[in-house]
């Protein structure tokens, strides 16, 4: 069985996350996708929004998709959240399955900065998506041993949404509608998230 792994701060989870993951699941035949909110990203630092809100938003975003599940693996571990540690734990749990690590091409470009990138590539195939129309040129593939044979790049659709820009817009009174799943937009509005907090 192929299992997709998709991690991030999800602050907030938005259509630029959900739609490419749906495309990946269909294209690569992923029987399950595990969504893993990070406690603290080593490259980003602590997210501005409390984990309980980020978890609630991911739960709402994936509701209705029984093949998409929410994991607390990184939230339950002491920070920071290293992908290689998460993949190591998952590979021990799913011994007979093939792990596929899903990420944007922006994250792929920085793969060499990750902890033990060669082990990341050994533990999981990489499926990297563009969030805008892909013309097939200009993609910088990092020099990581084994990556060339373990990498699939695909068009994630025209969903170029930045969580940072979204938070900034919401802080200025903007609406989340049209950029996040409907239930997530309602949650953001109900709990007045991101109001007056830019970045």
Regions found by a protein language model. Give the residues of each.
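Nucleotidyltransferase catalytic core that binds NTPs
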Residues: 1-199
């Amino acid at each position: 069985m192929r299992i997709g792994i998709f991690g991030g701060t999800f602050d907030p989870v938005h259509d630029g996350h959900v739609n490419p993951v749906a495309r990946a699941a269909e294209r690569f035949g992923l029987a399950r996708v595990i969504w893993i909110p990070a406690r603290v990203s080593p490259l980003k630092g602590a997210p501005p929004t409390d984990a309980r809100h980020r978890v609630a938003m991911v739960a709402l975003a994936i509701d209705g998709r029984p093949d998409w599940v929410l994991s607390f693996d990184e939230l339950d571990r002491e920070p920071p959240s290293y992908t290689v540690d998460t993949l190591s734990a998952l590979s021990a749990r799913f011994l007979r399955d093939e792990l596929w690590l899903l990420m944007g091409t922006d994250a792929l470009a920085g793969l060499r900065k990750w902890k033990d990138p060669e082990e990341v590539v050994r533990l999981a195939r990489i499926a990297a998506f563009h969030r805008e129309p892909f013309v097939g040129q200009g993609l910088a593939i990092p020099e990581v041993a084994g990556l060339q044979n373990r990498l699939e790049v695909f068009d994630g659709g025209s969903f170029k949404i930045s969580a940072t820009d979204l938070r900034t817009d919401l802080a200025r009174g903007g609406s989340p509608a049209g950029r996040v799943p409907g239930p997530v937009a309602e949650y953001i509005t109900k709990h007045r998230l991101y109001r007056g907090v830019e970045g």
